[in-house]
């Protein structure tokens, strides 16, 4: 059993700019995360459909993506679990000063979750600290908030993505170990788009079935996939080399050209699939020259 009384120590942020940005994001910047949203979600959760059986899940690996206040003593959590995907749940009494849940429900640390419920918002029945994840600080911490915002934007509720969950854990570990944030995030963005069905293979032309050739130029046509670049293509579509696409498929961002072109391609795809809606954490990272 984990030691609830002591709880984990919070990571210290070395950069005051990152500290201010992370505090802003943690409190109010993520879309729709306000008291009113919490109340509205709980109102919907109370409308239980009689024919729907109650769900009970025990000891599911997961992470807290975001938390916001509900009433005086509780929290609404947005969590990402291994087998059940994103879920909303109410943590009753979690805001009380001596609640055993307070030190457990922290960002970027693996926990074991148990819950029950029929509606959209489940009831957290147990949470245990698992640990084993290195602490995050500075630009790594802010990059991790960016991962959470991506998951909240792209992952539908109650849709399990075990492979994406594993990649999320691996990405947090890579960030904690000081790997270059931009390259680590490119890898996560690609896996996210592919696992959630927004993007397909980067190493194959879907129209012809041919493998991408390293010496040719290509575009990624939204909703269709990779094809040869043409003079008539919209100017907003980034032209990338076949070598870049092959490198991305192998999760290799070591070439300078691959790092540059993959960044432009991912910005384009994320902007398209989000229909122009801004990613707040991404803009902060761009301003800080981390993306």
From Swiss-Prot:
<dbReference type="InterPro" id="IPR012340">
    <property type="entry name" value="NA-bd_OB-fold"/>
</dbReference>
<dbReference type="InterPro" id="IPR042242">
    <property type="entry name" value="RecO_C"/>
</dbReference>
<dbReference type="Pfam" id="PF02565">
    <property type="entry name" value="RecO_C"/>
</dbReference>
<comment type="similarity">
    <text>Belongs to the RecO family.</text>
</comment>
<comment type="function">
    <text>Involved in DNA repair and RecF pathway recombination.</text>
</comment>
<dbReference type="GO" id="GO:0006302">
    <property type="term" value="P:double-strand break repair"/>
</dbReference>
<dbReference type="GO" id="GO:0006310">
    <property type="term" value="P:DNA recombination"/>
</dbReference>
<dbReference type="GO" id="GO:0043590">
    <property type="term" value="C:bacterial nucleoid"/>
</dbReference>
<keyword id="KW-0233">DNA recombination</keyword>
<dbReference type="Pfam" id="PF11967">
    <property type="entry name" value="RecO_N"/>
</dbReference>
<protein>
    <recommendedName>
        <fullName>DNA repair protein RecO</fullName>
    </recommendedName>
</protein>
<dbReference type="InterPro" id="IPR003717">
    <property type="entry name" value="RecO"/>
</dbReference>
<keyword id="KW-0227">DNA damage</keyword>
<keyword id="KW-0234">DNA repair</keyword>
<dbReference type="InterPro" id="IPR037278">
    <property type="entry name" value="ARFGAP/RecO"/>
</dbReference>
<dbReference type="InterPro" id="IPR022572">
    <property type="entry name" value="DNA_rep/recomb_RecO_N"/>
</dbReference>
């Amino acid at each position: 059993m984990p030691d609830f009384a002591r709880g984990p120590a919070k990571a210290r942020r070395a950069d005051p700019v990152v500290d201010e940005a992370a505090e802003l994001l943690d409190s109010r910047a993520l879309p729709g995360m306000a008291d009113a949203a919490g109340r509205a979600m709980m109102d919907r959760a109370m409308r239980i459909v009689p024919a729907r059986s109650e769900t009970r899940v025990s000891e599911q690996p997961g992470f807290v993506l975001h938390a916001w206040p509900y009433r005086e003593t509780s929290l609404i959590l947005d969590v990402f679990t291994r087998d059940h995907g994103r879920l909303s749940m109410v943590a009753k009494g979690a805001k009380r000063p001596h609640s055993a849940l307070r030190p457990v429900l922290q960002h970027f640390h693996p926990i074991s979750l148990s819950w029950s419920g029929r509606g959209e918002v489940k009831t957290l029945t147990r949470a245990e600290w698992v640990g084993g994840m290195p602490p995050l600080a500075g630009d790594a911490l802010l990059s991790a908030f960016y991962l959470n915002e991506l998951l909240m934007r792209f992952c539908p509720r109650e849709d399990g993505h075990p492979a994406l969950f594993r990649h999320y854990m691996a990405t947090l570990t890579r960030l904690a170990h000081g790997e270059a944030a931009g390259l680590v995030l490119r890898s996560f963005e690609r896996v996210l788009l592919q696992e959630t069905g927004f993007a397909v293979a980067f190493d194959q032309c879907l129209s012809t079935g041919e493998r991408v050739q390293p010496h040719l130029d290509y575009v990624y046509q939204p909703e269709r996939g990779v094809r040869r670049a043409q003079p008539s293509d919209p100017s907003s579509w980034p032209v990338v080399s076949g070598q870049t696409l092959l490198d991305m498929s192998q999760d290799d961002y070591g070439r300078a050209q691959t790092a540059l072109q993959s960044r432009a391609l991912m910005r384009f795809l994320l902007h398209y699939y989000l229909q122009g809606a801004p990613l707040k954490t991404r803009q902060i990272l761009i301003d800080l020259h981390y993306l």
